[in-house]
Amino acid sequence: MLLWSSGSTAACAQETRDKAASFYVGRISSVNAWHDLIKDPANAEFVDAYLAVAALSQVVGRYSDDRLTLEVEGQVGYNFGDQSHWEINLAAGPRWRQFPWSDVVATSVAFGLGLSMASEVPEVEVELEGASEQLLVYWNMDVTLGPPRSSWAVLLRLHHRSSAFGLLADDGGMNAVALGLRITF
């Protein structure tokens, strides 16, 4: 009864799940600006370059009656298609886990910000942006949807490498729209 009174059962079921493994595959878009990709996804154009990512995350803070968590995530990704290289990303950010419909469909939204290191200068980023670097800023936005009180959810993510307005490079970066699975444990 105490768990029920503290909020959604979907959120409460995740209270002790401080770790997650995510696996996703995405396709790189030729749309340069991430906000244009989000505003008009139906008209997005893509190149023949893809990425497959495995990630582990850890909750490092809980706030607002467990509705908001702070997470750190490490990723290993492989880029294939028109380019072939590895990518390592480390990001931290918030995840909101409580919505009015969470008892029907467990939902979360998240944002992560950190660094991305590619094993070589990504060819597709050079083609799209004119230049790039191995080390860029990395950020992501995602939405998860799954059954209430379940350890798994479908993951829809925008995976973004960026020069951060000249902070790490004059040009470079990419946007990938990805779909995968997130498992909490």
Placement of each model-derived feature along the sequence:
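Sec-dependent N-terminal signal peptides
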Residues: 1-2
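Short glycine/proline- and aromatic-enriched beta-strand/turn motifs that initiate or cap beta-hairpins
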Residues: 6-58, 182
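Outer-membrane beta-barrel transmembrane domain signature
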Residues: 58-65, 70-173, 182-185
